[in-house]
Amino acid sequence: AKLPDAEKSVITDSDKVIATLNSLCIEMDNRYALLAKANVRTIKEYNEEFIHRKLNPNNGHKFMPYIVVIIDEFADLIMMAGRDVEMPIARIAQKARAVGIHMIIATQRPSTTVITGNIKANFPARIAFRVMQMVDSRTILDAPGANQLIGRGDMLFTEGGDLKRIQCAFIDTPEVKRICEYISKQQGYPEPYELPEYKNPDSDAG
């Protein structure tokens, strides 16, 4: 998925990141409106209704693909974009999963200035690899333990309950390329899914 004026789905410009996150919030609200119009509660129920031709495209209905948003090095994004990204990220994490929009954030600096209480409250599923201090483990997992991991993929996982210790698989570059090639050969959309256009109200005011 991408913005209408974007060339690629991978974004590094902070202004475009803010626009994309707010666009995803618009997409989320639009999807909830369609679910309400179709009298269903989840994207799975909605798509089944659409596939079985119980929803008329002339009334605005359309098939909803799943969207996964991945933010690599969340701390850098906070430094570049400030808190402009925190509100849309919290909204997406809190509500969007029911309409097929999922979010993964990653950071190597798990401080409380990066992972705020608002962010933590909306990400019940968390993974921690080895960290240097117990306070970092508590910031991620609300529990100690990640500071005692041995590295090399050793990690702790929680969904808001008990901690589970898991061994993460190592995937090298050639394997990543083979996975990408396999995905690219699958039947799918001929072009990326376009997100709604987002207009920054501050730019209009100027």
Annotate each PLM feature:
Residues 1-2, 6-206:
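P-loop NTPase motor-domain active sites and their immediate coupling elements
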